[in-house]
UniProtKB/Swiss-Prot annotation:
The gene is MT-CO2. Component of the cytochrome c oxidase (complex IV, CIV), a multisubunit enzyme composed of 14 subunits. The complex is composed of a catalytic core of 3 subunits MT-CO1, MT-CO2 and MT-CO3, encoded in the mitochondrial DNA, and 11 supernumerary subunits COX4I, COX5A, COX5B, COX6A, COX6B, COX6C, COX7A, COX7B, COX7C, COX8 and NDUFA4, which are encoded in the nuclear genome. The keyword Signal does not apply. It comes from Rhynchomys isarogensis (Isarog shrew rat). This is Cytochrome c oxidase subunit 2. Residues 46-59 are mitochondrial matrix. The chain crosses the membrane at residues 15-45, 60-87. GO terms for biological process: ATP synthesis coupled electron transport. The keyword Cell inner membrane does not apply. GO terms for cellular component: mitochondrial inner membrane; respiratory chain complex IV. Mg(2+) binds at E198. Disulfide bonds: none annotated.
Length: 227
């Protein structure tokens, strides 16, 4: 999860987030190299009065600064498209969970079970227990099995919301009248926090998301106790 004064990304917990982290580093290195080259050229222009007459009208230079940016854009676009298709690909999900956004709480329905659904509200600050996180704890966590592909169907009952869990690389808009889907998969057990990431009204900041990823056997015991 995030912590105060954090500069980097949250620790990746899903394969998608690992790919996004690698793509971020890849793109950042390209930006760093281009910025260094531009700053070097600017410093030369400011500190010297020398000019190269052939650079004012040179076919070779014009060819290079046309082809090189195209190559750089391709190096950025190809891995980006690969990750984009990976995020949309859902093959044989082990479980499907329907998520509905409301003003200002989330409701969850496990569609593979006959009667397993609940609402998830933020716990008020006055009701927090020692060790709980302010504005992030909920009364009903969504419990999912780890190391299995899970399909999330996301929509909204009223206004625009966005269901986001950064450490899992998830951010999907909840739009009234439209059903979006996302894949959830975790490499390890634990608690993973998120929040509504679309301004949806006066209590937008009070719509936390808490995912509890557990082993399959633990999930089966939990689902049995909830039905």
């Amino acid at each position: 999860m995030a912590y105060p004064f954090q500069l980097g990304l949250q620790d990746a917990t899903s394969p998608i987030m690992e790919e996004l982290t690698n793509f971020h580093d890849h793109t950042l290195m390209i930006v760093f190299l281009i910025s260094s080259l531009v700053l070097y050229i600017i410093s030369l222009m400011l500190t010297t009065k020398l000019t190269h007459t052939s650079t004012m009208d040179a076919q070779e230079v014009e060819t290079i600064w046309t082809i090189l940016p195209a190559v750089i854009l391709i190096l950025i676009a190809l891995p980006s498209l690969r990750i984009l298709y990976m995020m949309d690909e859902i093959n044989n999900p082990a479980l499907t969970v329907k998520t509905m956004g409301h003003q200002w709480y989330w409701s969850y329905e496990y569609t593979d079970y006959e009667d397993l659904c609940f609402d998830s509200y933020m716990i008020p600050t006055n009701d927090l227990k020692p060790g709980d996180l302010r504005l992030l704890e909920v009364d009903n966590r969504i419990v999912l099995p780890m190391e299995l592909p899970i399909r999330m169907l996301i929509s909204s009952e009223d206004v625009l919301h966005s269901w986001a869990v950064p450490s899992l690389g998830l951010k999907t808009d909840a739009i009234p009248g439209r059903l979006n889907q996302a894949t959830v998969s975790s490499n390890r057990p634990g608690l993973f926090y998120g929040q509504c990431s679309e301004i949806c009204g006066s209590n937008h900041s009070f719509m936390p998301i808490v995912l509890e990823m557990v082993p399959l056997k633990t999930f089966e015991n939990w689902s049995t106790s909830m039905i």
